[in-house]
């Protein structure tokens, strides 16, 4: 599993932040959370959404990989990761290539989602929720044998 946070700009220069957890095997976004700030809660809430994902059965040796940002080195975050039964891995300091698939997702996301028309954080959240549904269930990917992430997951477990 991969996790990271990206900043988002919307109408009149307002900022929002998106935290995601991505399955690196299927490219499925398993959990995401949007906030208007970068407090620790953004990653803790993302972990809570991962925990409540009813379609998910985590492997006993699953690893959650991130950069070495302050959120991911926080003892509170690390404890919550451990409580989920995950092992934690972090990129080498200052090396974005270690989390390249997650960074790539954010790049595609920013190319495909137009948030400049959103006036409120609630509108941003709705756009992002709609995109995550589209990305996981309708957006075919060449590297997944031309399947969507959910189709590919189902293919792997069948």
Name every feature range the model reports, one short phrase each.
Residues 2-30, 36:
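An active-site-proximal beta-strand-loop segment
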Residues 13-14, 73-75:
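Catalytic cores and conserved motifs of cyclic dinucleotide signaling enzymes
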Residues 14, 32-57:
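Active-site beta-loop-alpha junctions of metal-dependent nucleic acid enzymes
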Residues 57-73, 92, 147-148:
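Acidic/histidine-rich, metal-coordinating catalytic segments
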Residues 63-68, 82-100, 117-119:
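RNase H-like polynucleotidyl transferase catalytic core
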Residues 75, 79-86, 110-158:
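C-terminal domain-tail junction helix/linker
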Residues 101-110:
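Short amphipathic alpha-helical "interface-anchor" segments enriched in bulky aromatics
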């Amino acid at each position: 599993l991969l996790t990271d946070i990206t900043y988002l700009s919307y109408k009149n220069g307002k900022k929002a932040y998106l935290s995601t957890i991505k399955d690196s095997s299927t490219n499925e976004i398993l959990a995401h959370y949007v906030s208007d700030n970068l407090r620790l809660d953004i990653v803790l809430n993302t972990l809570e959404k991962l925990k409540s994902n009813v379609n998910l059965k985590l492997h006993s040796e699953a690893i959650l990989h991130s950069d070495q940002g302050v959120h991911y080195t926080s003892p509170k975050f690390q404890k919550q990761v451990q409580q989920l039964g995950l092992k934690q891995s972090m990129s080498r300091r200052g090396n974005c290539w270690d989390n390249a698939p997650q960074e790539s997702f954010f790049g595609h996301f920013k190319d495909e989602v137009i948030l400049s028309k959103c006036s409120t954080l609630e509108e941003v959240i709705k756009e992002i929720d709609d995109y995550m549904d589209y990305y996981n269930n309708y957006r075919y990917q060449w590297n997944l044998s031309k399947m969507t992430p959910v189709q590919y997951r189902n293919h792997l477990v069948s």
